[in-house]
């Protein structure tokens, strides 16, 4: 029996145990994991160092190495996230709605775990902790399949989680890692319908598109972040500068960083040159259309591919438009339905933008960097969904649940 199938069978078995665990039991397990991560920090960092060294040998970009890197502070941040997760209300067992029918039947809609969650992701070893702990909090078994670039880190983290769970009432197999990082193991996970209730891809556009195209199991799509900010002609100059610099340069390798700015031509004529200089001073490489290049001849001429690309680095595309309608058309054509923003003092244009732009999160006069479970007040998140079914936007605890109906009667039969 191959690894993926064996772990699928075990996960299904464990899921039936997890549904019986109380909130206190689950929280005790989470606390044990947080403690064990601190106790074994040196071991985790030693294994992470192996991934970093191998990544450098393979010529990984600085942005990819940053996503791969763990240090003491990042592990502390993981444990703080787990502590916050413990404090969140457990959604399992809550009554979503209840009513009584004229025939006396009492109907309740109850929140329940999804069952077995598959998680396939790239680079970031912190996702291993996030996915494992969020699934445990919601009573789900989880099968993790990270990338080869983070295999040493992921194996170390999961072994630490197993040692923590063995101190609690939760089965250690509640969290399992597929150690085979070949394409074959991924394909097997895509079709594990008998054992997997949902598969969540988290990574770049190529990974997500592959999962959506090839998986026969249900998929919760966490889309790539080809995010835009439109600077309307009435936008406040300093506000626009602050928001764009934050949304691009604070952490360019994340999915809610912007990849394109769309400038109204009247605003660009006044402030474009200064904005471009400010961005270049911060190491940003600009690629613009003809109108942008006319403002600053040092800007590279953008290609069609640039409008479509999630750079995840200090590269930014620039589009200059004549109207809000033209901006909306560009964003809807090239955006990934993740996070889009408008900076303007014109409420009519805000209304047009919010009504017409198709994305999970829309902003007025704020950075797209806020599309995040903790920033939304959800606490933990397992990803940001860009699809429309089941859940959209940051996926907090309720996103990893389903519902079932519980009907109580006193002998009713249907006539």
Curated annotation (Swiss-Prot):
Associated pathway: Amino-acid biosynthesis; L-proline biosynthesis; L-glutamate 5-semialdehyde from L-glutamate: step 2/2
Catalytic activity reported: L-glutamate 5-semialdehyde + phosphate + NADP(+) = L-glutamyl 5-phosphate + NADPH + H(+)
Pfam families tied to this protein: Aldedh (PF00171)
First-listed, main subcellular location of the protein, grouped into a coarse class: cytoplasm
E.C. no: 1.2.1.41
Subcellular location: Cytoplasm
Gene Ontology biological process terms from the UniProt entry: L-proline biosynthetic process
MF annotations from Gene Ontology: glutamate-5-semialdehyde dehydrogenase activity; NADP binding
Any one Gene Ontology cellular component term annotated for this protein: cytoplasm
InterPro entries in alphabetical order: Ald_DH/histidinol_DH (IPR016161), Ald_DH_C (IPR016163), Ald_DH_N (IPR016162), Aldehyde_DH_dom (IPR015590), G-glutamylP_reductase_CS (IPR020593), Glu-5-SA_DH (IPR012134), GPR_dom (IPR000965)
SUPFAM superfamilies the UniProt entry points to: ALDH-like (SSF53720)
UniProt keyword Oxidoreductase, yes or no: yes
Sorted UniProt keywords: Amino-acid biosynthesis, Cytoplasm, NADP, Oxidoreductase, Proline biosynthesis
Domain of life: Bacteria
Family membership noted in the UniProt record: Belongs to the gamma-glutamyl phosphate reductase family.
Function: Catalyzes the NADPH-dependent reduction of L-glutamate 5-phosphate into L-glutamate 5-semialdehyde and phosphate. The product spontaneously undergoes cyclization to form 1-pyrroline-5-carboxylate.
Protein name (Swiss-Prot/TrEMBL): Gamma-glutamyl phosphate reductase
């Amino acid at each position: 029996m191959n690894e993926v199938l064996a772990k699928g069978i075990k996960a299904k078995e464990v899921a039936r145990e997890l549904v019986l665990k109380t909130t206190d039991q689950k929280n005790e397990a989470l606390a044990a994991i947080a403690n064990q991560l601190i106790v074994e920090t040196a071991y985790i960092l030693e294994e992470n160092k192996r991934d970093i060294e191998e990544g450098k040998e393979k010529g990984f970009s600085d942005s990819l190495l940053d996503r791969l890197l763990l240090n003491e502070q990042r592990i502390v941040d993981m444990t703080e996230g787990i502590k916050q997760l413990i404090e969140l209300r457990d959604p399992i067992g809550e009554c979503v709605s209840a009513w009584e029918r004229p025939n006396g039947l009492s109907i309740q809609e109850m929140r329940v775990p999804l069952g077995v969650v598959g998680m396939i992701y790239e680079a970031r070893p912190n996702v291993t902790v996030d996915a494992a702990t969020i699934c445990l909090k919601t009573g789900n078994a989880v099968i993790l399949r990270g990338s080869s670039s983070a295999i040493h880190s992921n194996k170390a983290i999961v072994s630490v989680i197993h040692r923590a769970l063995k101190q609690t009432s939760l089965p250690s197999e509640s969290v399992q890692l597929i150690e085979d990082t070949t394409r074959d193991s991924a394909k097997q996970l895509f079709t594990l319908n008998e054992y997997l209730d949902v598969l969540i891809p988290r990574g770049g556009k190529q990974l997500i598109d592959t999962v959506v195209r090839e998986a026969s199991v249900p998929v919760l799509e966490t889309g790539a972040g080809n995010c835009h900010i439109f600077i309307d002609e009435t936008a406040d100059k300093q506000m626009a500068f602050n928001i764009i610099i934050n949304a691009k340069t604070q952490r360019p390798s994340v999915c809610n960083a912007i990849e394109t700015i769309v400038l109204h031509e009247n605003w660009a004529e006044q402030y474009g040159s200064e904005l471009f200089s400010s961005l270049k001073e911060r190491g940003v490489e600009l690629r613009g259309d003809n109108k942008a290049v006319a403002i600053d001849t040092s800007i590279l001429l953008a290609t069609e591919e640039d409008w479509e690309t999630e750079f995840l680095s200090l590269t930014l595309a620039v589009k200059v438009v004549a109207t809000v309608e033209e901006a909306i058309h560009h964003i809807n054509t090239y955006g990934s339905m993740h996070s889009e923003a408008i900076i303007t003092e014109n409420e009519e244009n805000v209304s047009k933008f919010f009504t017409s732009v198709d994305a999970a999160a829309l902003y007025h006069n704020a950075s797209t960097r806020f599309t995040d479970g903790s920033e939304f007040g959800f606490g933990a998140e397992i990803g940001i969904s860009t699809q429309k079914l089941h859940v959209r936007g940051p996926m907090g605890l309720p996103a990893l649940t389903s519902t079932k109906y519980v009907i109580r009667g006193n002998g009713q039969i249907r006539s």
